[in-house]
């Protein structure tokens, strides 16, 4: 059984891939104060690939097409 969390913020990120859109990730409460546009974060994309992404924007609205994954870490502030 999967556990669902409530998040205050979500971020839209730019991935280092030839993809035509932004992807939205959930921000864990313990990382909220560290996330801002332009900051690099570590995210999982796909089943096992980890990437460094750049935060494009912050929103309170979760995506409607999919359940967002959490960011794994903030790389720089």
Where do the model's predicted regions map?
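Accessory, non-ATPase domains that flank or precede helicase/AAA+ motor cores in DNA-metabolism machines
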Residues: 1-77
């Amino acid at each position: 059984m999967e556990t669902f969390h409530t998040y205050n913020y979500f971020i839209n990120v730019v991935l280092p891939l030839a993809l035509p859109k932004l992807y939205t990730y959930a921000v864990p409460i313990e990382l909220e104060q560290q996330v801002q546009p332009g900051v690099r974060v570590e995210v999982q994309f796909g089943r096992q690939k980890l990437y460094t992404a750049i935060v494009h924007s912050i929103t309170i609205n979760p995506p409607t097409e999919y359940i967002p994954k959490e960011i794994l870490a903030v790389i720089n502030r």
